[in-house]
Amino acid sequence: TERFAGTLRGVEDRIDYLRELGVTYLHLMPLLTPRPGDSDGGYAVADYRTVRPDLGTMDDLEHLAGELRAEGISLVVDLVLNHVAAEHEWAVRARAGEQRYRDYFLIFPDRTEPDAYERTLPEVFPDFAPGNFTWDDGVGGWVWTTFNSFQWDLNWRNPHVMAEFAGIVLDLANRGV
């Protein structure tokens, strides 16, 4: 978004250009609110219900979706489903000891299971984020972190995780995304 037009309103100002190119499908890279600082290009989402402030607002996203649709262009946003930022509310509540939210993640009390997994798991970023598990003092355990230590993998065996994302997807769909 920012490299093409600066903001969501900027993208809206370029719809005529997109139409002239024959674009019928516009995929915007991560634009939901990431963690502060290093966010792996926006893939460490801290809030799925808000847009990065420098890009605009959820109302701007909804307006853009409507304007694009009126021109025959479908809009999709990159929705990160594997993990959330360590600063996301669910991780914060897991650190606070709320069992419901601890269960949103794969947390191990010692290295027994992580070491067994590590024998066969490839490392995504071996040079700067080696391993797939990160010790977190707040939860008192090893958190599965496939990409970076600040990206906590979600436990998709937990139906509450599915329900949370169903709500997120429905909210975006109701906004025209």
Where do the protein language model's features map onto the residues?
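Acidic/aromatic-lined carbohydrate-recognition and catalytic surfaces
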Residues: T1-A166, L170, N174
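C-terminal substrate-recognition regions of SAM-dependent nucleic acid methyltransferases
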Residues: V177
